[in-house]
C-alpha cells in the first residue's frame, strides 16, 4: 500500500465508549462512570458520560475535567472530524474518611 493512498478504518462505538470512560475515570473525584453512550454522525463523535462523584467535590470542575480528559483521549487516538461530549453527574458517593 502506498503511504499517500487514503486508508479507511472505523472505530466502533464500543471502543469510543471505552476510551472516554477510561480517560474520564482519571479525573479527581470520580468514583465511577455509571453509563456511557457513543454515536458517530457524519464523522462527528457524540459521547455522553454519566458520572458517580465523590460527595463534596466541585461538581462543575469535575464535569469539565471528565469532559476535557475524554476529549483529549478521543482526539489523540481517533482524530474525529468533530467531537461532542456531554457529562451528567448522576449520583454522589459518601465515602468514609481516610
Across the structure, where does each feature detected by a protein language model lie?
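Short acidic, glycine/proline-enriched loop segments that cap or flank alpha-helices
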Residues: 8, 54-58, 62
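Low-complexity, polar/amphipathic intrinsically disordered segments that mediate membrane, lipid-surface
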Residues: 2, 94-98
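Short edge beta-strands and adjacent turn/loop segments
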Residues: 27-54, 89-94
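Flexible domain-boundary/linker segments
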Residues: 37, 41, 66, 80-83, ...
